[in-house]
């Protein structure tokens, strides 16, 4: 909106050219989303408390979690609101990639909202039936995947970029739709599984979004893309502004979600943010780097798969409890130690992933 306004006024008022610069809009995006989150936080928390929308805690979980029972949840609403408002203000709304990410994020947000609503309002601990949750996640992901495939068919936008190999970029064809589906749905559910401790999911999300912001800028810059031997995709640079909005909104939410949390994001936040990260990774053609950057999300998901598989096949559990962050809690690690160590791991993985852009 502001980008369009600046474009309209710039011929008469050269000062407005500043609002067209990507770096300026990225900085303003962080600040806008951060301020909006900080402003909305106390108001949303008070409203959730008034409506008695509190966290449901499993009876078989760590005893330290019993004190979390009743803590306001569905705080992801303020994250999504801050990101959406910021995107509408500071991005170029003629860019189709912006709308693709927002569509997935808000669509998954609705799925998560229904899931949370059934848990906390209808007192149904299972929330939305799993098959319906995956059905709607799949519908949204497949619609976006098909639309993106038709938009970039047989171009660099549908190639697979393989880390460490500068000349290995196979054209995916229809496999692009399959890959996109699994990346979006998989990342969404991985972030959802990680969201089990105060601040555990939001800070890695912020870090990965920051890493994706750099990749989006590099991919959208013809000279830098050539220097790094990655595909040049002109529309991706605008994703920098959206990524920084995620960073700002996430940091604002962390203000209230840090240990001991005043609010949890709920599925409305975790499913939506995971879906957004997956979509961004697809758009910048770095799905494999997302696996590295989001290593904590991958680790949490794999721990659940191994736990369930081992119990069904052998009747034995590998971990004391899954996802794996609960395993460390039951080993006696204080919650803040688990959280901060997972943050440090994520920071290392994001830096490693960015370094691979040059190691080719």
UniProtKB/Swiss-Prot annotation:
Role played: Catalyzes the initial step of the lipid cycle reactions in the biosynthesis of the cell wall peptidoglycan: transfers peptidoglycan precursor phospho-MurNAc-pentapeptide from UDP-MurNAc-pentapeptide onto the lipid carrier undecaprenyl phosphate, yielding undecaprenyl-pyrophosphoryl-MurNAc-pentapeptide, known as lipid I.
GO molecular-function terms, A-Z: metal ion binding; phospho-N-acetylmuramoyl-pentapeptide-transferase activity; UDP-N-acetylmuramoyl-L-alanyl-D-glutamyl-meso-2,6-diaminopimelyl-D-alanyl-D-alanine:undecaprenyl-phosphate transferase activity
Pathway where it operates: Cell wall biogenesis; peptidoglycan biosynthesis
Known EC number: 2.7.8.13
Protein location: Cell inner membrane
Gene Ontology BP terms: cell division; cell wall organization; peptidoglycan biosynthetic process; regulation of cell shape
Annotated organism of origin: Photobacterium profundum (strain SS9)
Regions crossing the membrane: 26-46, 70-90, 94-114, 132-152, 168-188, 199-219, 239-259, 263-283, 288-308, 338-358
Swiss-Prot/TrEMBL catalytic activity: UDP-N-acetyl-alpha-D-muramoyl-L-alanyl-gamma-D-glutamyl-meso-2,6-diaminopimeloyl-D-alanyl-D-alanine + di-trans,octa-cis-undecaprenyl phosphate = di-trans,octa-cis-undecaprenyl diphospho-N-acetyl-alpha-D-muramoyl-L-alanyl-D-glutamyl-meso-2,6-diaminopimeloyl-D-alanyl-D-alanine + UMP
UniProt similarity note: Belongs to the glycosyltransferase 4 family. MraY subfamily.
UniProt cofactor(s): Mg(2+)
Enzyme class: transferase
Keyword vocabulary terms for this entry: Cell cycle, Cell division, Cell inner membrane, Cell membrane, Cell shape, Cell wall biogenesis/degradation, Magnesium, Membrane, Metal-binding, Peptidoglycan synthesis, Transferase, Transmembrane, Transmembrane helix
GO cellular component: plasma membrane
Bilayer topology: Multi-pass membrane protein
Protein name: Phospho-N-acetylmuramoyl-pentapeptide-transferase
């Amino acid at each position: 909106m502001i980008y369009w306004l600046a474009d309209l006024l710039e011929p008469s008022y050269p000062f407005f050219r500043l609002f067209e610069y990507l770096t300026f809009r990225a900085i303003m995006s962080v600040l806008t989303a951060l301020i909006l989150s900080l402003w909305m936080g106390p108001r949303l928390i008070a409203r959730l408390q008034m409506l008695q929308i509190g966290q449901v805690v499993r009876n078989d979980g760590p005893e330290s979690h019993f004190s979390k029972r009743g803590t306001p949840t569905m705080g992801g609403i303020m994250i999504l609101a801050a990101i959406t408002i910021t995107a509408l203000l500071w991005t170029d709304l003629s860019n189709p990639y912006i709308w693709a990410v927002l569509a997935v994020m808000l669509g998954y947000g609705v799925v998560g909202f229904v899931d949370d609503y059934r848990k906390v309002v209808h007192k149904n601990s299972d929330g939305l039936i799993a098959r319906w949750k995956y059905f709607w996640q799949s519908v949204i992901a497949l619609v976006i995947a098909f639309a993106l495939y038709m938009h970039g068919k047989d171009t660099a936008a549908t190639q697979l970029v393989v880390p460490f190999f500068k000349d290995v970029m196979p054209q995916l064809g229809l496999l692009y739709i399959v890959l996109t589906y699994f990346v979006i749905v998989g990342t969404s559910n991985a972030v959802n599984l990680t969201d089990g401790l105060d601040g555990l999911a939001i800070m890695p999300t912020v870090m990965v979004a920051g890493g994706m912001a750099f990749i989006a800028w590099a991919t959208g810059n013809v000279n830098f893309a050539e220097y790094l031997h990655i595909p040049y995709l002109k529309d991706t640079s605008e994703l920098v502004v959206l990524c920084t909005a995620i960073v700002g909104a996430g940091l604002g939410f962390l203000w209230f979600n840090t240990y001991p949390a005043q609010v949890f994001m709920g599925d409305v936040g975790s499913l939506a943010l995971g879906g957004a990260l997956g979509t961004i990774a697809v758009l910048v053609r770095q799905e494999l780097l997302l696996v590295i950057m989001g290593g904590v999300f991958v680790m949490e998901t794999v721990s659940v798969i191994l736990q369930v598989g081992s119990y069904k096949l052998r009747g034995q559990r590998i971990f004391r409890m899954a996802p794996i962050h609960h395993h460390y809690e039951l080993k006696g690690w204080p919650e803040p130690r688990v959280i901060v160590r997972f943050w440090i791991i994520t920071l290392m993985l994001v830096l490693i992933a960015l370094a691979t852009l040059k190691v080719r």
